[in-house]
């Protein structure tokens, strides 16, 4: 064993597990194509103030969880991105996207970093996929983003998910609600945990996010944000719900739902799974019209998005048996060489097969034929192609189907034509 180990809260992924990630990533990319979302990639680190302004200085992410490091030569602190939305909005403003087209639909599959206590489904380096729709935040835009997210879950076969949705109102609504919450919790200040006491002073909405079971009843009896939302905000929220019903998306209205990031406004949502225990959130999102202004864009930009944690999603899939039998695809052909001196010719044969689009593996360690066949079976190769002196001289190679054990003798051109994957037309 090496004296060097992976850093706590990080994980190595090898091919037998990577195939699970590839399954999810493939579904995300396919659904993104169906919904006409294009991929966006942003730097893995940004200036720290981007997240302080964008996410909110009173949030746990900014206050406790960011990996910030030595300033750049200009003396500005840098931070490994803890979430994607602020970086995507920064990129959109920098590129001045909305001057090029009124609407942009973007998706990502990206690694993120937070100083969390490592546990099942929560790592310090983790992966999220998500989407950002910039230029519109109408009920139709919200329904579009939600349909994309729930469509991914449906395509993966996940069952028992719970979509909770709420309206957070606008800035004025939330300001009045914060005052009401502070007045409600203040008489119970001695009963609050230290984290909630801090939140009571800075942003009492964050108390509603508490996972402390001792506060459950107190939080449940708190005033509802919904009661502070203006009539037009309520009507807009009802239209979102109507569109979700039209699309067959099941949901629960949860008036205590708030998101852990300060940029959300109006519609917010969260998806949970009973497979994950107390920390049951798989993903969530909502509208964030004011983020562009907060980041120096000069005015609000209509926007709505979501993010889903890949590690947590995979845990839920595993518990539902959706990953059983999933393994890396083996090579189509394993070239078995009988004499070591024919290894050069075996490499030429493998090269020609690969150039024809046929996945091919061969022995690179000078092993016996028996050992080579064991390796072909271990890898799950579909065929073994045998090269001995006779095959080398005649140009006729033995090809064995490793499933049916059927064997034939063919030229390399014939083998190529037999095994080549049919091209897609149209």
UniProtKB/Swiss-Prot annotation:
The EC number(s) given in the record are: 6.1.1.21
- Catalytic activity as recorded in UniProt: tRNA(His) + L-histidine + ATP = L-histidyl-tRNA(His) + AMP + diphosphate + H(+)
Recorded hits in CDD domains, A to Z, give: HisRS-like_core, HisRS_anticodon
Annotated Gene Ontology cellular component terms: cytoplasm
Keyword check for Aminoacyl-tRNA synthetase, yes or no: yes
Protein family = Belongs to the class-II aminoacyl-tRNA synthetase family.
Top-tier EC class:
ligase
The record's subcellular location field reads: Cytoplasm
Q: Which keywords are on file for this protein? A: Aminoacyl-tRNA synthetase, ATP-binding, Cytoplasm, Ligase, Nucleotide-binding, Protein biosynthesis
Q: Which GO terms describe its biological process?
A: histidyl-tRNA aminoacylation
Q: Which residues cross the membrane?
A: none
One annotated GO molecular function: histidine-tRNA ligase activity
Q: How does it assemble?
A: Homodimer.
Cysteine pairs forming cystine bridges in this chain are none
Asked if the Swiss-Prot or TrEMBL record annotates the protein with the keyword Transmembrane, the reply is no
Give the matching PROSITE patterns: AA_TRNA_LIGASE_II (PS50862)
Q: What is this protein called?
A: Histidine--tRNA ligase
């Amino acid at each position: 064993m090496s004296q060097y180990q992976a850093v706590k809260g990080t994980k190595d992924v090898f091919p037998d597990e990577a195939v699970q990630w590839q399954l999810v990533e493939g579904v995300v990319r396919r659904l993104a194509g169906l919904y006409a979302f294009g991929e966006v990639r942003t730097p893995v680190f940004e200036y720290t103030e981007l997240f302080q302004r964008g996410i909110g200085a009173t949030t746990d992410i900014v206050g406790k969880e960011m990996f910030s490091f030595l300033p750049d030569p200009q003396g500005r602190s840098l931070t490994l991105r803890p979430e994607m939305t602020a970086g995507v909005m920064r990129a959109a403003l920098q590129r001045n996207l909305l001057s090029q087209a009124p609407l942009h639909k973007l998706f990502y599959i990206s690694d993120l970093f937070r100083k969390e206590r490592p546990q099942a489904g929560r790592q310090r380096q983790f992966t999220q996929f998500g989407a950002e729709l910039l230029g519109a935040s109408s009920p139709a835009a919200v329904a579009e983003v939600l349909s994309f997210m729930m469509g991914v879950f449906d395509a993966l076969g996940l069952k028992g998910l719970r979509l909770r949705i709420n309206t957070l109102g606008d800035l004025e609504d939330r300001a009045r609600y914060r005052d009401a919450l502070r007045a409600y919790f203040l008489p119970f200040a001695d009963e609050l945990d230290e984290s909630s006491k801090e939140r009571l002073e800075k942003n009492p909405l964050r108390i509603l996010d508490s996972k402390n079971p001792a506060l459950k009843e107190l939080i449940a009896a708190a005033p509802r944000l919904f009661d502070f939302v203006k009539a037009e905000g309520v009507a807009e929220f009802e239209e979102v719900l109507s569109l979700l019903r039209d699309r067959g998306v099941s949901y629960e209205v949860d008036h205590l739902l708030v998101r852990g990031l300060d940029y959300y406004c109006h519609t917010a949502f969260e998806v949970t799974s009973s497979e994950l225990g107390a920390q049951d959130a798989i993903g969530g999102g909502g509208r964030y019209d004011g983020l562009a202004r907060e980041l120096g864009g000069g005015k609000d930009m209509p926007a709505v998005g979501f993010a889903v944690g890949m590690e947590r999603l995979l845990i839920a899939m595993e518990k539902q048996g959706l990953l059983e039998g999933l393994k890396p695809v083996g090579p189509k052909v394993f070239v078995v060489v009988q004499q070591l001196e024919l290894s050069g010719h075996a490499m030429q044969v493998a090269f020609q097969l690969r150039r024809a689009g046929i996945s091919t593996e061969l022995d690179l360690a000078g092993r016996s034929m028996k050992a080579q066949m064991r390796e072909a079976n271990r890898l799950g190769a579909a065929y073994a192609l045998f090269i001995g002196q006779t095959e080398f001289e005649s140009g006729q190679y033995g090809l064995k189907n490793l499933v049916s054990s059927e064997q034939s003798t063919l030229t390399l051109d014939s083998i190529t034509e037999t095994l080549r994957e049919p091209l897609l037309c149209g």
